[in-house]
Amino acid sequence: DWIYNSFKENKAYDVMVAELLDPHMPDHPLRFVLRQDHTRILKSAADTAQVFLATQMKCAACHNHFDNKEWSQRRFMGFAGYFSDKDLELIKCEARTNEFVPTGFVFDMPSIPTDVPQTEDERAARIAQLLIDPCNPRFAKTIVNRLWKRFLGMGLFEPVDNFREDTPASH
């Protein structure tokens, strides 16, 4: 019902994304983005990056990405910290390192606050705001590319859920 009503009300896309991820938003739907199994935090972070940033980070949950040097495990774990209530431990080949990665956004933006919220709900609210921030270089590109593909048959970059700085636009 939430998504249907949001479209019916002509709700802005960035507002819908904020409502989807931020538990403090007035129309917050069920938090289906956050999965319930033991790897919920890493899957939630990877899924959010893929859907809203066109960035596949699943590999970086366990190791540095093999063919995309842009995504290190450390960078992914910093992003995933927003889906937890604490900084996450860096795990190497399933071995604990006792090294915790500070929570941080995946892109440098002038508007990123330097403090990190302490509770999971506050962190979810922060990641929602960072995703839709006008200074975020990927958010608008991602939805435009998805719509371009939907209506014109091919995205400006392909595949639509794996934008890479080292891959030129398809046309």
Annotate each predicted stretch with a short phrase.
Residues 1-114, 121-129, 133-171:
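Short, structured secondary-structure elements
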